[in-house]
Structures are given as structure tokens and as C-alpha cells.
């Protein structure tokens, strides 16, 4: 069992790992249905071939949601100390190709 960590116990740049996930078309279709983001870059292979990426690209917010703290090694450390998740910022360095 991990020791409970509070806000002041963390340091900038600290890393927590999330197990690898295999995404399928079902994930992308479900996300598009839930959010209404039906841009063809996410589901149309022929359209995607005409873009600078050349392949379909995962929804940015779907990718960000896969980093949820509950799925990481952070979860057991904050279980008894977290009150609410207030904010998250993301910077996408490269596209996640489908």
C-alpha cells in the first residue's frame, strides 16, 4: 500500500505511469457519438489520406481522457486525500494516428 500524498507532497515534473491501452474503432465511434465530433479526420480513411497526416487521427480529448489519474500509478497515492479534480492542461506534441 502506498503512502497518501497531498498537494504539497508533489513536485513539478513528477511522473506517474499509465498502462498501455489498445484503442479500437469502437472507442473512436463511441467518443464521436458522445461528443458530436464527427469530423471525417477521425473516421474517414479516404478523407484522412488527403490531409497532412495521411491517416485518421484520434480525437484530442479522447487521448487526454486516457490519462485520467484513476488509471495511473497516482491513484492509490491520492485516494484518501483528493477532494476534486480541478483542472488539467494538455499539449499535443504529435498526432495519435489510427
Stretch-by-stretch model annotation:
Residues 1-58:
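Catalytic strand-loop segment that frames the active site of acyl-thioester-processing enzymes
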Residues 49-58, 62-98:
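Hydrophobic beta-strand-centered segment that forms part of the acyl-chain substrate-binding groove
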